[in-house]
């Protein structure tokens, strides 16, 4: 049986609508990662700092990014889901980030079937304080691991869509195109 990473499609209408496989629900300190070679989730670690993920966090299947991992996605949803949940989301922006010297940008997306966030159409519609919370989390969550991360700011929807297209192309170059 194949990993969800390879078996779940990118989405119904990429890059405007993509699937996300949730790895870490909002409010968790446990870092899960989807296994790439078999179906399942691996527990990577418990965060060293007393912080929790401020959003549901996961990946777009059948993507590959500069850091060698799938494209990361932060999902705006009013209730936490669970590791392994798959949802269709709409990208609205991107947080530019460097993790230990490697580009590790993260897509910000909205779960449209949640009336608490479905009105969000663009990065400018997101509460500025929430964007600050997200950036602060990713700036500090690895400090006690003695690892350096740096948030470089936010970019809009067009930049996010282009980055998703790049990550799809990188996946196809490595693994081949799948139906």
Swiss-Prot record:
GO terms for molecular function: inorganic diphosphate phosphatase activity; magnesium ion binding. GO terms for cellular component: cytoplasm. It catalyses: diphosphate + H2O = 2 phosphate + H(+). Mg(2+) 2 binds at residue 72. It is an enzyme of class 3 (hydrolase). The keyword Methyltransferase does not apply. One of its GO terms (biological process) is phosphate-containing compound metabolic process. Keywords: Cytoplasm, Hydrolase, Magnesium, Metal-binding. InterPro entries: Pyrophosphatase, Pyrophosphatase_sf. Its cofactor is Mg(2+). It is found in: Cytoplasm. Gene3D superfamilies: Inorganic pyrophosphatase (3.90.80.10). Homohexamer. This is Inorganic pyrophosphatase. It comes from Thermoplasma acidophilum (strain ATCC 25905 / DSM 1728 / JCM 9062 / NBRC 15155 / AMRC-C165). The lineage of its organism: Archaea, Methanobacteriati, Thermoplasmatota, Thermoplasmata, Thermoplasmatales. The gene is ppa.
């Amino acid at each position: 049986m194949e990993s969800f990473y390879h078996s779940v499609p990118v989405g119904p209408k990429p890059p405007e609508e993509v699937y996300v496989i949730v790895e870490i629900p909002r409010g968790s300190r446990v870092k899960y990662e989807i296994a790439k070679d078999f179906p399942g989730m691996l527990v990577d670690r418990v965060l060293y700092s007393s912080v929790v993920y401020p959003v549901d966090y996961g990946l777009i299947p059948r993507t590959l990014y500069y850091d060698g991992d799938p494209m990361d996605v932060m999902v705006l949803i009013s209730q936490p889901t669970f590791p392994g949940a798959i949802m269709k989301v709409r990208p609205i922006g991107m947080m530019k980030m460097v993790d230990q010297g490697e580009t590790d940008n993260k897509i910000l997306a909205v779960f449209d079937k949640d009336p608490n966030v479905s009105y969000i159409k663009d990065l400018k519609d997101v509460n500025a304080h929430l964007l600050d919370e997200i950036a602060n989390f990713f700036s500090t969550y690895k400090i006690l691991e003695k690892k350096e991360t740096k948030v470089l700011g936010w970019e809009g929807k067009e930049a996010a869509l282009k980055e998703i297209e790049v990550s799809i192309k990188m996946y196809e170059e490595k693994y081949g195109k799948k139906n």
